Swiss-Prot record:
Protein name, as recorded: Dihydroxy-acid dehydratase
Pathway membership: Amino-acid biosynthesis; L-isoleucine biosynthesis; L-isoleucine from 2-oxobutanoate: step 3/4; Amino-acid biosynthesis; L-valine biosynthesis; L-valine from pyruvate: step 3/4
PROSITE patterns: ILVD_EDD_1, ILVD_EDD_2
The protein's enzyme class: lyase
Lineage, uppermost ranks: Bacteria, Pseudomonadati, Elusimicrobiota, Endomicrobiia, Endomicrobiales
Annotated source species: Endomicrobium trichonymphae
């Protein structure tokens, strides 16, 4: 066992002495040491219920014949960090999480890991660590939140409260209604209720085979989630004994399966950042072209919030990820899972329990939820969640309204300075320029709440929340901070969007773009000290997954 390096031989007497001081017994030295990387925090709704899950994981590890050791990992709530300077830190926290898990696991020579995760950057960060360390590991995602109820309708945090800000600003609802809604939309613990980034990543984690069957869609408050945590603890010890490692599971086939599921579910555009970053740690390249190639061949068979009216609880009741895999199995490749079953076996053994939620025979859309666009604005690509774009906005031309930060754009939107026919361009919000590639949920939600999502588009080198809907194009590469063509766009330029043709262009010649780029004076860095200042110097382009050099 790997842990023998800290517990065997006379020379390790000091190490054993310290281990005994934690309360373990001599007999425990013969057992695998299993770390539980817990991202519990009182700050994040998706993570507040993890104390219970920690106990069940511990019990499972002990029942399986291992010794559990809990250690902490940070978690950022993108919803709480949204719309202010705190959002600079969200994407960068992914790398911190990966580095911290690697540090603890290697410093203490752990034999295996349970990665207790849930929210947006935590799950990819922990998967990056698993692929990098390549020691037996299972991810336990803590589960989605139940829907809220207000005015006789089910509600969610992302679509209802963020868009309510725009509705209030437009005079469509009162301050009292806004207050009542914010109290009702989030009834308890769990990740935000729709197919936003956290739940998308949970679904893809299960599809890739890194979590147990049913884990992704089981609600945070359910007893079933506790049983999954317990079973995961037992199973990770078996993986250690059989020497089954993450890179045995995280193969190119597994990543392709994840992209297929992503497209079928209409998942978050943030997966186009996270899957390549995880694959990079496993020594696999996932180019943007692969996402688009798979999207064109994969119908969208589920439509959850924000694009539709279903929630994670509905997907779970319809059979969860196994039922989704059953519906798309002809597009899947054989791949191992932590459960010991091939992903095709899991798909074949499932059934669809609600054909209105999972529409295998009558897909919601003929193509997958995400499209990759290219053109003279984004020669290295950009991303749009086409599942959340109305048909009338899939081909659109408009006048550029240019802002060098999200804050300035948001002020213009709330001051009613954006009108139908405009295309809002927000730049210097990329991985390096942001820094941290802030999510633009506040401006997109405000536009929708003000009734402009069918007449105004938004482009950015930043990114979008999984809760974004409307013609919102992000991840424009190269970014403004890297002298990308987005800096050449001036106020009033005409921009043409054609999602079916996968193009995004400004009506300028190549020579005009080059000349304008040469005259640009870059703004001062927004953050000059601390982690994010270092991050800005090391982070690569969005089309690489925004990984560090």
């Amino acid at each position: 066992m790997r842990s023998d390096q800290i517990k065997r031989g006379a020379v390790r007497a000091p190490n054993r002495c310290l281990l005994y001081s934690t309360g373990i017994s001599p007999g425990d030295l013969d057992k695998p040491f299993i770390g539980i990387a817990s991202s519990f925090t009182d700050l994040v709704p998706g993570h507040v219920a993890m104390r219970d899950l920690e106990r069940y994981v511990e019990r499972g590890i002990a029942a399986g014949g291992g010794v559990p050791f809990i250690f902490g990992a940070p978690a950022v709530c993108d919803g709480i960090a949204m719309g202010h300077s705190g959002m600079h830190y969200s994407l960068g926290s992914r790398e911190i999480i990966a580095d911290l898990v690697e540090t603890v696991a290697n410093a203490h020579m752990l034999d295996g890991l349970i990665l207790l995760s849930n929210c947006d950057k935590v799950t990819p960060g922990m998967l990056m660590a698993a692929a990098r360390l390549n020691i037996p590991a299972i991810v336990v995602t803590a589960g989605a939140m139940m829907t809220g109820m207000y005015d006789k309708k089910r509600r969610s945090m992302v679509r209802d409260t963020f868009e309510a800000v725009g509705q209030f600003q437009a005079g469509k609802i009162t301050e009292k209604q806004l207050s009542e809604l914010e109290m009702a939309a989030c009834p308890g613990a769990g990740a935000c209720q729709g197919m936003y980034t956290a739940n998308t990543m949970a679904c893809l984690t299960e599809t890739m085979g890194m979590s147990m069957r049913g884990c992704a869609t089981t609600l945070a408050v359910s007893a079933k989630k506790k049983r999954i945590a317990y079973e995961s603890g037992i199973r990770v010890v078996a993986l250690v004994k059989k020497d089954v490692k993450p890179r045995d599971i995280l193969t190119l086939a597994a990543f392709k399966n994840a992209i297929v599921a992503d497209m079928a579910l209409g998942g978050s555009t943030n997966t186009v950042l996270h899957l390549p970053a995880i694959a990079n740690e496993a020594g696999i390249e996932l180019p943007l072209e692969l996402f688009d190639e798979i999207s064109k061949k994969t119908p969208q068979i589920a439509c959850l919030e924000p694009a539709g009216d279903h929630y994670m609880e509905d997907l779970d009741n319809a059979g969860g990820i196994p039922a989704v895999l059953f519906a798309i199995q002809k597009n899947l490749a054989h791949s191992k899972t932590v459960s010991g079953f091939d992903i095709i076996e899991i798909a074949n053994s499932a059934e669809i329990l609600d054909e209105y939620v999972i529409r295998a025979k009558n897909p919601y859309k003929p193509e997958g939820g995400i499209a990759i666009l290219r053109g003279n604005i984004a020669p290295r690509g950009c991303v749009v969640k086409q599942a959340a774009v109305s048909e009338k906005m899939k081909v659109f031309s408009g006048r550029a309204r240019v802002f060098n930060s999200e804050d300035n754009a948001m002020k213009a939107i709330l001051d009613n300075k954006i009108v139908p026919g405009d295309i809002v361009v927000i730049r210097y919000e990329g991985p390096a320029g942001g820094p941290g590639m802030r999510e633009m949920l506040s401006p997109t939600s405000a536009l929708h709440g003000m009734g402009l999502s069918d007449s105004v588009a938004l482009l950015t080198d930043g990114r979008f929340s999984g809760g974004t809907r409307g013609p919102c194009i992000g991840h424009i590469s190269p970014e403004a901070a890297a002298d990308g063509a987005i800096v050449a766009i001036n106020e009033g330029d005409t921009i043409n969007i054609n999602i079916p043709e996968r193009t995004l262009n400004v009506e300028l010649t190549d020579d005009e773009i080059k000349a304008r780029i040469g005259k640009v004076i870059k703004p001062e860095p927004k953050i000059k000290t601390g982690y994010m200042a270092r991050y800005a110097k090391l982070v690569q382009s969005a089309d690489t997954g925004a990984v560090l050099k």
